[in-house]
């Protein structure tokens, strides 16, 4: 049934009734396993229901419990004592992390620690060599300083990004009302809201925020907006009556920080500050620990591999060096050199810059990223848990269907509502429109004539706002039309009568009759009618028309829409002459025998772009789950309209209805879709929820509490999913914080949701998430290419030391030279790969599996190290031996030459031609070899960056010049190489020497070989999917 027949507060239960709660069970399970601690135990306890019974107590019992008076309030003395005992009515901020600790964390990550160790070794080597008067001591000093600079600069960049994020608790503090009207000792006055205590008697009116959790004692037409707390778009009635055993569903409790829309109310404060529901949510959100992002896990995994290999090879070289007679100091220098060669010093900067670039790209598309690592996480997302109100929907009630003249007509629910197509010539329609316009207390805020009708601000509740805007769009000047029918009497809507009635004089001064109009719950309105208006004629309301009404009502209610009935009655001049004194207390006018005009249904409609966005998510293998505090029928209807429940999918209830069998006789695995409400979720075992998520691909959770949203996210994560949570309300903030990535709405989103989220959609458009997913997948793809490019040169940087120790040739490559490769020439091409376009439709691929699809996997390492890296090593040694031979040192003579070459006292070492070389001349030649090997690596790296443009498609298909940043980076790389080679002063500072032009040409055939070799690899991958070739060579 639709929601017109009841104006109940939907459940936001925090946990269990007598049967216990899923969060509580999970808490017990975790404790039994030995995990937890006080922080976790406290967090789990927050997921339990607020154990209060104030809503069930009589006024006298409340007075006794809180030592207060329902008429005079607390005494000032007792209020002061309670304030001293309980503290102010404010949210307690959590202990913040000191800024120096945040900065220190940026300097102490896995890769940073490895670089600190390398820098320390360099400093130790420099100190020892300096004490011995070694001529090459400056190398190690420069190397140490460069490594420290890299760590500090990248740490400062990361700290700056973190510094821009705001503390989550600040948004909740913004929700605290400034003033509250309180009665103490019988005197009414205003105080700061943070001075309220339990037992205070307070008053509130339309436009006020509820200053605490309040037990309602008296109310007149009071309605509150719980959308920021529960996710519902409809206003909720507040009254003194206890309507539900749960304190969170009864109408006689008003929640702290919710907005009072209209009417007045008086009540007793029963909870303040952190003990209120909003306080518990604030504690829950700030208590949820930040989970590591997938990209952080991937980088840690990569660092572990690199650190292990660096230490393994470094220790091996150290032992070998000691065994063959090197001193401890020289062996430590080898160890340090291997670490420096293996640690990709530029990777830290590369990853940070790549993520920043993509974040800026997303910002241009209305996606603001607060946490850089969240960029890639969104691309890894396999499940999106989306709030309904304001995220999938427009967060405004809109007239969607009308039933008059025995036909259901569809209204336009798009953002501009400009396409009303139903017949507006019928006399019945005119009568219905007259009733819905006059029987309406909502009004436009003045000064909005130039504002489009759907965007105008209206003073009134959501339903009446929808009716007023609909009337304005169809009639024209609705407020002017209303003025032509002056109101003389009114009965506001209340939960007992469930109708609103008003009496008006007619616009024609010659017609002295009065017009009575009524709207309300359809069945309540119909029972007061004796006739029905059909095509302008009043017909008896017989059984046939009652069945027609029931059919239409069930049809609209089944769509999850809120349905209202409308009727009217012309009061005769004889019985109700002009100036007649209508009395709403005495009811001296008829309220039965009315004429039924029709039905109007309203819904918070989906955004126009959402269905297509959901379809794209489905195509990309991403599961969209709706999690809302709204009614199950409404949630299911919206889910079906946007494609979360696809066409033809059935729930267990749908199958039972189709087969006409009880629900318990249906195999749940036959149902593709499933709708679970909060009460059902509360009684489910954790394993049952996980099984439901595994069994039903299409899931909708309705009437859920903030804590249950958190449990749902945790259950999805237990299935191995990377979970994104979208939302805009306060109720969403704990789940936003817990999720792998939280996505908040920028326009309608609360400050709490924005601060809890990792990403903010500035246009509140769910469809923008699809853009984020695509960019996230692209950044992972490009990071993979960048890392593959970065790793390749590790082999040509490592093998010179291997040959140096094992074959005893003069050292081909110096540590400072390696650092220039890492931080100067190669960082620009590496970063430029972040600008590379997607090589195929990545939105047709399934999300990556974090356990299988690693950033650095075996095929990538094998291909980079042992294939492309090996070719680059051959190129380097070819160029090295060429340069040595042209200066008189043939390859065979170089073997075993190292001891004599490095002997400071030997000043007449003969080359292959018999020429004698001093130590200074030999050192000059060694620096020349450093430069030659450096240039060889750089020439091969140009070919390497070109092949890294794609992993599967041919480079010719991708295009060589589409990525202009990469072309510029290659040119810049060559310019830096020339500068280092030919700039005066370089030999004395960084050990770079001018080299002959032909030595630049030696590595070029190897670069061509790299390109051709990779094109053959890609051809095999494309032609033989699933084959050994594909599995081993596709990284």
UniProtKB/Swiss-Prot annotation:
Keywords of the record: ATP-binding, Cell membrane, Hydrogen ion transport, Ion transport, Magnesium, Membrane, Metal-binding, Nucleotide-binding, Phosphoprotein, Potassium, Potassium transport, Translocase, Transmembrane, Transmembrane helix, Transport
Record field: catalytic activity: K(+)(out) + ATP + H2O + H(+)(in) = K(+)(in) + ADP + phosphate + 2 H(+)(out)
Residues passing through the membrane, by range: 99-119, 143-163, 300-319, 332-349, 784-803, 814-834, 855-877, 930-949, 964-982, 998-1018
GO MF term list: ATP binding; ATP hydrolysis activity; magnesium ion binding; P-type potassium:proton transporter activity; P-type sodium:potassium-exchanging transporter activity; potassium ion binding
Family matches, as InterPro entries: ATPase_P-typ_cation-transptr_C (IPR006068), ATPase_P-typ_cation-transptr_N (IPR004014), ATPase_P-typ_cyto_dom_N (IPR023299), ATPase_P-typ_H/K-transp_N (IPR015127), ATPase_P-typ_P_site (IPR018303), ATPase_P-typ_TM_dom_sf (IPR023298), ATPase_P-typ_transduc_dom_A_sf (IPR008250), Cation_transp_ATPase_P-type (IPR050510)
Positions bearing Phosphoserine: 27, 463, 601, 840, 954
UniProt-listed PANTHER family: POTASSIUM-TRANSPORTING ATPASE ALPHA CHAIN 1, SODIUM/POTASSIUM-TRANSPORTING ATPASE SUBUNIT ALPHA
Job of this protein: The catalytic subunit of the gastric H(+)/K(+) ATPase pump which transports H(+) ions in exchange for K(+) ions across the apical membrane of parietal cells. Uses ATP as an energy source to pump H(+) ions to the gastric lumen while transporting K(+) ion from the lumen into the cell. Remarkably generates a million-fold proton gradient across the gastric parietal cell membrane, acidifying the gastric juice down to pH 1.
Name of this chain's protein: Potassium-transporting ATPase alpha chain 1
Species this chain originates from: Oryctolagus cuniculus
């Amino acid at each position: 049934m639709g929601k017109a027949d009841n104006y109940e507060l939907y459940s936001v239960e925090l946990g269990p009734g007598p049967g216990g709660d899923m969060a509580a069970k999970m808490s017990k399970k975790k404790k039994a396993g030995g995990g937890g601690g006080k922080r976790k135990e406290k967090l789990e306890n927050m997921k339990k229901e607020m154990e209060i019974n104030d809503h069930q107590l009589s006024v006298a019992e409340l007075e006794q419990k809180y030592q207060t008076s329902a008429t005079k309030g607390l005494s000032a003395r007792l209020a002061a004592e309670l304030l001293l005992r309980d503290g102010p009515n404010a949210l307690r901020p959590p202990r913040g992390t000191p800024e120096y600790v945040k900065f220190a964390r940026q300097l102490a990550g896995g890769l940073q620690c490895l670089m600190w160790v390398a820098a320390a070794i360099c400093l130790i080597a420099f100190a020892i060599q300096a004490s011995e008067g070694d001529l090459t001591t400056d190398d190690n000093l420069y190397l140490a300083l460069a490594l420290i600079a890299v760590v500090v600069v990248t740490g400062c960049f990361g700290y700056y990004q973190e510094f821009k994020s705001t503390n989550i608790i600040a948004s909740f503090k913004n929700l605290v009302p400034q003033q509250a009207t309180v009665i103490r000792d019988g005197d009414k006055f205003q105080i700061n809201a943070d001075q309220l205590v339990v037992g205070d008697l307070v008053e509130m009116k339309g436009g006020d925020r509820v200053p605490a959790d309040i037990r309602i004692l008296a109310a007149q037409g009071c309605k509150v907006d719980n959308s920021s707390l529960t996710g519902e778009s409809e206003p909720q009635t507040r009254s003194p009556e206890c309507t539900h055993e749960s304190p969170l569903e009864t109408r006689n409790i008003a929640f702290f920080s919710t907005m009072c829309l209209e009417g007045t109310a008086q009540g007793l404060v029963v909870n303040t500050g952190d003990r209120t529901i909003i306080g518990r949510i604030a504690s829950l959100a700030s208590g949820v620990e930040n989970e590591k992002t997938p990209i952080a896990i991937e980088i840690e995994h990569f660092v572990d591999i690199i650190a292990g290999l660096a230490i393994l090879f470094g220790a091996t070289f150290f032992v070998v060096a000691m065994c063959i007679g090197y001193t401890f100091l020289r062996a430590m220098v080898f160890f340090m050199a291997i670490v420096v060669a293996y640690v990709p010093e530029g990777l830290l900067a590369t990853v940070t810059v790549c993520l920043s670039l993509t974040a800026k790209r997303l910002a241009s598309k209305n996606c603001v990223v607060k946490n850089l690592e969240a960029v890639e996480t969104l691309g890894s997302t396999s499940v999106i848990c989306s709030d309904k109100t304001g995220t999938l929907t427009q967060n405004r009630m809109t007239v969607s269907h009308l039933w008059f003249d025995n036909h259901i007509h569809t209204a336009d629910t798009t953002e501009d509502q400009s396409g009303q197509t139903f017949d507006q010539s019928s006399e019945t329609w005119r009568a219905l429109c007259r009733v819905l316009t006059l029987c309406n207390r909502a009004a436009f805020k003045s000064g909005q004539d130039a504002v489009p009708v759907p965007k105008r601000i209206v003073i009134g509740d959501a339903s009446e706002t929808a009716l007023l805007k609909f009337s304005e769009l169809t009639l024209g000047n609705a407020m002017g039309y209303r003025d032509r029918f002056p109101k003389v009497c009114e009965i506001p809507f209340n939960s007992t009568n469930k109708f609103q009635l008003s009496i008006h004089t007619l616009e024609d001064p010659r017609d002295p009759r009065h017009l009575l109009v009524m709207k309300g719950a359809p069945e309540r309105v119909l029972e007061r009618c004796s006739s029905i208006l059909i095509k302008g004629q009043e017909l008896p309301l017989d059984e046939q028309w009652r069945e027609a009404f029931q059919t239409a009502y069930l049809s609209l209610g089944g769509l999850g829409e809120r349905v209202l009935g409308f009727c009217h009655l012309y009061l005769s001049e004889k019985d109700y002459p002009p100036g007649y004194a209508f009395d709403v207390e005495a009811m001296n006018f008829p309220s039965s025998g009315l004429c039924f005009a029709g039905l109007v249904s309203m819904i918070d409609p989906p955004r126009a772009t959402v269905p297509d966005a959901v379809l794209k998510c489905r195509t990309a293998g991403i599961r969209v789950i709706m999690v809302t505090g709204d009614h199950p029928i409404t949630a299911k209807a919206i889910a079906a309209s946007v494609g979360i429940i696809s066409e033809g999918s059935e729930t267990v209830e749908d199958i039972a209805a189709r087969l006409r069998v009880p629900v318990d006789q249906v195999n749940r695995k036959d149902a593709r879709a499933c709708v679970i409400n909060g009460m059902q979720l509360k009684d489910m075992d954790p394993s049952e929820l996980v099984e439901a998520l595994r069994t039903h691909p299409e899931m909708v959770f309705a009437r859920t509490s903030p804590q249950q949203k958190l449990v749902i996210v945790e259950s999805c994560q237990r299935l191995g999913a990377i979970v994104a949570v979208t939302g805009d309300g306060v109720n969403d903030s704990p789940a936003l914080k817990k999720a792998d990535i939280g996505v908040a709405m920028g326009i309608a989103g609360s400050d709490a949701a924005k601060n809890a989220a990792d990403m903010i959609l500035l246009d509140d458009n769910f469809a923008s998430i699809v853009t984020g997913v695509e960019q996230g997948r692209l950044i992972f793809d490009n990071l993979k290419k960048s890392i593959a490019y970065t790793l390749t040169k590790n082999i040509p940087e490592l093998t010179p030391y291997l040959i140096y120790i094992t074959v005893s040739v003069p050292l081909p490559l110096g540590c400072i030279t390696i650092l220039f490769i890492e931080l100067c020439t190669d960082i620009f091409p590496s970063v430029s790969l972040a600008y590379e376009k997607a090589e195929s439709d990545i939105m047709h691929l399934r999300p990556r599996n974090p356990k299988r699809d690693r950033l650095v996997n075996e095929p990538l390492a094998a291909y980079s190290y042992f294939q492309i890296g090996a070719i680059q090593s051959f190129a380097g040694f070819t160029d090295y031996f060429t340069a040595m031979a042209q200066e008189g040192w043939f390859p065979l003579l170089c073997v075993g030459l190292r001891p004599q070459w490095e002997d400071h006292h030997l000043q007449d070492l003969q080359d292959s031609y018999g020429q004698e070389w001093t130590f200074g001349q030999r050192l000059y030649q060694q620096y020349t070899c450093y430069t030659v090997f450096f240039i060889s690596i750089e020439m091969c790296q140009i070919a390497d960056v070109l092949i890294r443009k794609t992993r599967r498609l041919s480079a010719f298909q991708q295009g060589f010049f589409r990525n202009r940043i990469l072309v510029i980076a290659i040119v810049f790389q060559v310019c830096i190489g020339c500068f280092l080679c030919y700039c005066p002063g370089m030999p004395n500072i960084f050990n770079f020497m001018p080299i002959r032009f032909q030595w630049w040409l030696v590595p070029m055939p190897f670069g061509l070989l790299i390109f051709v070799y990779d094109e053959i690899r890609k051809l095999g991958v494309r032609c033989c999917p699933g084959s050994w070739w594909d599995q081993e060579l596709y990284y």
